[in-house]
């Protein structure tokens, strides 16, 4: 079995962060989202992975390399334009050959990984196995319709009137039968080759398509709110570790201070992770905050936020529920609001009331 990881797309819902960074490389708990998926694939016993890349291919390739750090062998497949999930399968046809494969969306996060899903697929080997979860607003997703016996009878991409609340999670397992389905597709009204149409073709052609409804946590980290929520979830399971320098501080709960970091005269309430080389002085860092490497936080309060590497936050009364990019400077401005809620792209310069 191989894996096909989709790491293209423009990440419009995470702009301005993704103007300068691939969305799959935005970190959660100081580790890129894509890396969690690659680790899950390796844990499922898969060793060969094709990574579909677009305009950010150089950045993705530099981060992942040959895949050996994950126990994988990575091959990069260039998709010139984001023309749908089924189009990614189409351009990967030669790479996939006659192997079964798992298709994994690189900006998705699934608690517990995919090992159990892969084991079930290997044992039963349906033509397709789709991962489903119940959502409050299925209109934003591909939606599956099941019959009274729990069999998949229909799929629809982002329907105006959903027939169920079962959304397709960004993990699919296929036999080579999917290639016959993709070959028959025509572009949808969105101008894309839809994987839901390909799976529907399998259903209509009498192939076995099995659902797997997950009860665990899944998020598409394509927007800031979901990114912050996944960051919260990962930090909740972190183990406390103090490898850096801590002086005259109050440290409470699950706090990670990486080697080379310095925290002085501050209060840190976990779960929190503080990256290598970061200096925090006279500040409060509250729960569910990730601060990347080589940052400066001085005389400020921050909580429930993600701060990327080399950012500087100085003299700011309070920041919460924010995603702050690389090399950002946040400093006081004359007036003082109660709190600041920010999404700042790399190299931004922002003045904020203190």
Task: Identify the role of each PLM range.
Residues 25, 144-146, 211:
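A structural signal for short hydrophobic beta-strand segments in well-ordered beta-sheet cores
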Residues 55, 173-174, 222:
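A conserved hydrophobic position in a structured secondary element of the catalytic/binding core
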Residues 110-189:
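Conserved core of the sugar-phosphate nucleotidyltransferase
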Residues 1-5, 13-16, 26-27, 31-105, ...:
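Conserved N-terminal catalytic core of the sugar/cofactor nucleotidyltransferase
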Residues 9, 107, 134, 223:
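Active-site glycine-centered loops adjacent to acidic/histidine catalytic or metal-binding residues
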Residues 24, 73-75, 151, 208-210:
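Conserved beta-strand segments of alpha/beta enzyme cores
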Residues 50-54, 131-132, 306, 323:
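Short internal beta-strands
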Residues 177, 184-354:
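Left-handed beta-helix
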């Amino acid at each position: 079995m191989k894996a096909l990881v989709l790491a293209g797309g423009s990440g419009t819902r995470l702009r301005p962060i993704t103007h300068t960074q691939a969305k799959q490389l935005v970190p959660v708990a100081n580790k890129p989202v894509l890396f969690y998926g690659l680790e899950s694939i390796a844990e499922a016993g898969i060793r060969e992975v094709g990574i579909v890349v677009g305009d950010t291919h150089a950045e993705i390739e530099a981060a992942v390399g040959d895949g050996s750090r994950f126990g994988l062998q990575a091959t990069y497949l260039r998709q010139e334009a984001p023309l749908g999930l089924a189009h990614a399968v189409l351009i990967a046809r030669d790479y996939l050959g006659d192997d079964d494969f798992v298709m994994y969306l690189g900006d998705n996060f699934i608690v517990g990984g995919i090992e159990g899903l892969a084991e079930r697929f290997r044992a039963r080997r349906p033509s397709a196995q789709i991962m489903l979860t119940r959502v409050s607003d299925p209109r934003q997703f591909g939606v599956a319709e099941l019959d009274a016996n729990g069999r998949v009878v229909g799929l629809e991409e982002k329907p105006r009137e959903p027939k169920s609340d079962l959304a397709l999670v960004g993990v699919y397992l296929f036999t080579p039968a999917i290639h016959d389905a993709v070959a028959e597709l025509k572009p949808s009204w969105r101008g894309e080759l839809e994987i839901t149409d390909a799976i529907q073709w399998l259903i209509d052609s009498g192939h076995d398509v099995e659902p797997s409804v997950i009860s665990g946590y899944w998020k598409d980290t394509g927007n800031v709110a979901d990114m912050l929520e996944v960051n919260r979830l990962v930090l909740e399971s972190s183990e406390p570790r103090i490898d850096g320098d801590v002086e005259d501080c109050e440290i409470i709960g699950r706090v990670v201070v990486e080697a080379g970091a310095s925290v002085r005269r501050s209060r840190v309430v976990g779960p929190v992770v503080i990256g290598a080389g970061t200096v925090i002085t006279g500040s409060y860092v509250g729960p569910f905050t990730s601060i990347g490497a080589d940052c400066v936080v001085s005389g400020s309060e921050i909580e429930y936020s993600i701060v990327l590497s080399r950012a500087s936050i100085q003299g700011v009364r309070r920041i919460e529920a924010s995603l702050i990019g690389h090399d950002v400077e946040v400093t006081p401005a004359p007036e003082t609001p109660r709190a600041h809620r920010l999404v700042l792209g790399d190299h931004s310069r922002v003045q904020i009331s203190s």
